[in-house]
Every structure is written in C-alpha cells, then in structure tokens.
C-alpha cells in the first residue's frame, strides 16, 4: 500500500513534510512524495533519506482561492488526487490548503453514493478514550439530511477505529428532545429514524470530552468553533500548569515527581498526535492536516491513513450509507 503525500502543502513545506515522511517510512509506511522534484530531493538529501518523488511543478498557496485547483492540473494536491483515482496510491495526505484539498477531492474523485456533502472528522480526547465529531469545518451551513449522512460516516470511522457498538449524539444546547435551533430540531427525528438504537439523542459540548457518545454530529461552523476552542483551552491549561510548576523551588521539585505523568497528559491533548482529519464522503481515502503541522504530525497523519485503509474505511462508509433506514 502506498500513500501520496502533498510535499508542498503546509506552512513549512517541503522541509517539515519531507521530514515527517521520512519518519513514517522508518515505521513501515510506503510514501510517495508529490511536489517540486528539485526542492523535495534537496530535502531528502539533507536528511539522508531515499523516498520516491512524483514531480508536480505547481502548488496552491494558503492565501490563494480554493477554486484555483480547478484550473491548475499540475498543482501537487490535484496530481495526488489523480494518482489516487488511477489506483497508483491508496490514500492522499495533505497538510496544505484545506479548501483546495476538498475541492481537488470533489473534482477528481467525486462523492460516495448517498452523500450530499463530504465532512471532516475531528478526533477529541475524552474520559472514555476518544470522541469523533463531524463536521469539523467542511460545511458551514448544513441541511438536516447532511447530519444523517455525517452520522453514518462517523459510525463507519468509529468502527474502523475499533469501537464496539458506537452511538451518535446530536450536538445541542440541552439534552432534551426539542432543544436547539431549527437544524437540530429537524435533524433529531431523522437521526432517530435512520439510526435506531445507535442514536443516543442530544448531547452538549461537555459530552464531547466526557465521551458520552463515540460520535457527535453538528454543522461545520459549530464543529470548527468547538475544535478551535478545544485547541486554545488545551494550550492555556498546559501554560497554567507549567507556570504553577515553575513558580517556586518547592514547585519545581514537585514537577520532577510528576514529569512523566504530565508528559502523558500533554501527549493526549497535542494535535500532532492525531496527525490529520479524514475527509469522509469522497471516493477515496483523503486526510487533511493543519498547515502549521510539524514533522510528528505529518508522520502520524501518514500512520493514520495507513491504518484506516487497512481497516477498509471506504468500504465501511459505503456500507453504512447504504444501510440508512430512510
């Protein structure tokens, strides 16, 4: 199995991206770097690594419009999608322009049957392990039917990740049926009819971290706000802990005793540990990461893509969508 990595995608590409690819290759991932061959090979030489490169002379910059991918067939992310469509790779990972990656996936791969809009799945750490939220930002405005499809795809991903009998919660401002805006109120009966016992009902923001359900569905605007809020809060809490543990000589002594435990906590809330978000609902395995990703995040994105392809994620998504009871 081979994964195409957009070597030109990200704030610090190709340096960080190539470094992450080299690290993933050492852990058994077969990576094909797609990008400007001269730049990519220069980075490989600097690292003393030997990975295959597919030349793509163009790339979509962060400040450019996502629609640019339509008129630039030699852009690295579009070339990677073409390789996926032809079966020369089994997944695509990009840490670059998320809008351009979404546009390229829709343009080249198309949607899975039964999907009106693809969704980004975001993984949150929780007291029970992890919670998968859709949509993480691909669709700011949603119809109720979109949330039903998000739920089916989220269940497929949770099952591919090893969850047993996962359930879906609908993000709202109260647990009771009837709470929430028009979208939530209209989606509730559709989810109940489509999912049966797999639908838990309404959940609140805190339930994402409590792990009340394995999957949470919402519109992409709300989902992205939740993601950025969680990232900011994690950063603030870690900063406060660091300040408290370095505030005095006694505190620094105490810090030595809990150093390993704190390192484990930090790892659980570090976005780099999750690598990239899967774009569910397109005809192929596509993963989109942070533009600010470091080499660890790139490596973990590739490892996640490999694991999900091996778990048959796309087939699971198709099956879940075809089994909807509506």
From Swiss-Prot:
Localization annotation: Cytoplasm
Keyword Cytoplasm part of the UniProt annotation: yes
Pfam families (UniProt xref): FA_synthesis
Principal location class: cytoplasm
Keywords linked to the UniProt accession: Cytoplasm, Lipid biosynthesis, Lipid metabolism, Phospholipid biosynthesis, Phospholipid metabolism, Transferase
GO biological process: fatty acid biosynthetic process; phospholipid biosynthetic process
Enzyme Commission number, as recorded: 2.3.1.274
Quaternary organization: Homodimer. Probably interacts with PlsY.
HAMAP family attached to this UniProt entry: PlsX
Protein name stated in the entry: Phosphate acyltransferase
Species per Swiss-Prot/TrEMBL record: Thermus thermophilus (strain ATCC 27634 / DSM 579 / HB8)
């Amino acid at each position: 199995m081979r994964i195409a990595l957009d070597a030109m995608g990200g704030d610090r590409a190709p340096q960080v991206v190539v470094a992450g690819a080299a690290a993933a290759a050492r852990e058994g991932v077969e990576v094909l770097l797609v990008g400007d061959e001269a730049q990519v090979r220069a980075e490989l030489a600097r690292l003393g690594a030997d990975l295959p490169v597919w030349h793509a002379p163009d790339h979509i910059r962060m400040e450019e419009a996502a629609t640019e991918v339509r008129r630039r067939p030699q852009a690295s992310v579009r070339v990677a999608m073409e390789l996926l469509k032809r079966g020369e790779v089994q997944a695509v990972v990009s840490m670059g322009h998320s809008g351009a990656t979404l546009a390229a996936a829709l343009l080249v791969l198309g949607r899975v049957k039964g999907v009106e809009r693809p969704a980004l799945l975001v993984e949150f750490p929780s007291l029970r392990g992890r919670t998968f939220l859709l949509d993480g930002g691909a669709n700011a405005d949603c119809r109720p039917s979109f949330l039903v499809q998000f739920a089916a795809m989220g269940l497929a991903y949770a099952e591919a990740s090893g969850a047993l009998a996962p359930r879906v919660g609908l993000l709202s401002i109260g647990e009771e049926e009837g709470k929430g805006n028009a979208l939530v109120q209209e989606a509730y009966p559709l989810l109940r009819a489509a999912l049966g016992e797999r639908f838990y009902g309404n959940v609140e923001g805190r339930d994402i971290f409590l792990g009340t359900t394995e999957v949470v569905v919402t519109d992409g605007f709300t989902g992205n706000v939740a993601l950025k809020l969680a990232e900011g809060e994690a950063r603030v809490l870690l900063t406060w802990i660091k300040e408290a543990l370095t505030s005095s000589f006694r505190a620094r002594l105490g810090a030595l005793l809990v150093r390993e435990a704190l390192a484990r906590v930090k790892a659980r809330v570090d976005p780099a540990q999750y690598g990239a978000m899967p774009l569910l609902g397109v005809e192929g395995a596509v993963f989109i990461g942070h533009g600010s990703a470091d080499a660890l995040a790139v490596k973990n994105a590739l490892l996640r893509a490999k694991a999900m392809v091996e778990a048959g994620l796309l087939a699971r998504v198709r099956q879940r969508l075809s089994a909807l009871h509506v």
